[in-house]
A protein has these predicted regions:
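Short, surface-exposed interaction patches in beta-rich subdomains
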Residues: 124-191
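Short linear S-[DN]-x-LW-Φ motif typified by the pepsin-like aspartic protease active-site region
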Residues: 23-81, 124, 185-191
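Secondary-structure transition/turn motif
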Residues: 70, 88-99
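C-terminal motif of bacterial Sec signal peptides marking the signal peptidase cleavage site
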Residues: 17-20
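Short, T/G/N/S-enriched strand-turn elements that build extracellular solenoid repeat scaffolds
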Residues: 33-35, 52-57, 75-78, 100-106, ...
Length: 191
C-alpha cells in the first residue's frame, strides 16, 4: 500500500514537472540589442506584452531602440517604413529580467504615438506628439508630455486605478487616449 502511495506521488510530481516544461519558454539567455535608424519618422506603433516602455527624446538625428532579445531567435519585429516605426513582439518573454524597451527619438513633434502592452509600464520623457493612443492591462502610464494639457482632447479610462488626467472634451486635432485596466495614469505637461 505504501509503495502505491509513493508511486502515485511520483507520478503526480512527474506530470507537474513535465507540464511546467511544456507551458513555459526558457528565456534564460538573452542580450540587450539595439536598432538604429536615420530614416525620418512621424509615427510610432507598438504592439507588445509583458514589457516596460520608455520613450525619450535626444538632440540627435538618429532613432535608437534598446531592447532584450534572444541571441538565436528574435522575439521582435522592428522596422521603419513609410515614416512609421513599428515594433511588434512575436513571442512571449516570461523569465527575462531586463524586459524593457527604451525608444530614444530625435527631438521634434510627432504625428502619432500608439502603444499597446499587457503587463508593463509606459513612461514618457518630454515627448511631443499630436496624438497619443496607449493601452495597458496591468501597468501604469506616467511621465511628462511636451506641450499644454489644454490643447488636447483627452479621453482617459482607468478600471482599477487612479488618474491625474481628466477627460477634456474640446474641438482639437490633438488627442490623448489612455486606457489602463489595473494601474494608474500620472502625466504632467511642460507648459
Amino acid at each position: 500500500m505504501m509503495r502505491k502511495f509513493f508511486l502515485g506521488i511520483l507520478l503526480v510530481a512527474s506530470m507537474g514537472i513535465l507540464s511546467g516544461c511544456l507551458v513555459t519558454d526558457n528565456h534564460d539567455e538573452y542580450e540587450r540589442q539595439q536598432f538604429r535608424s536615420t530614416e525620418e519618422i512621424s509615427e510610432i506603433s507598438v504592439t507588445d506584452s509583458s514589457t516596460n516602455y520608455t520613450l525619450q527624446v535626444s538632440d540627435t538625428e538618429e532613432l535608437l531602440v534598446e531592447y532584450s532579445d534572444s541571441p538565436t531567435q528574435s522575439w521582435y519585429n522592428i522596422d521603419v517604413a513609410d515614416g512609421t516605426l513599428k515594433i511588434e513582439k512575436t513571442q512571449g518573454t516570461v523569465g527575462v529580467e531586463e524586459n524593457s524597451v527604451i525608444i530614444t527619438l530625435p527631438e521634434k513633434e510627432y504625428q502619432s504615438i500608439a502603444i499597446e502592452t499587457s503587463n508593463g509600464d509606459i513612461t514618457f520623457e518630454n515627448v511631443f506628439s499630436d496624438k497619443y493612443k496607449c493601452s495597458v492591462e496591468n501597468g501604469d502610464i506616467t511621465g511628462t508630455l511636451n506641450g499644454s494639457e489644454a490643447d488636447y482632447l483627452i479621453v482617459v479610462k482607468t478600471e482599477n486605478g487612479d488618474s491625474n488626467l481628466k477627460d477634456n472634451v474640446i474641438e482639437s486635432s490633438k488627442r490623448i487616449e489612455f486606457n489602463v485596466e489595473n494601474g494608474d495614469i500620472d502625466i504632467s505637461f511642460t507648459k
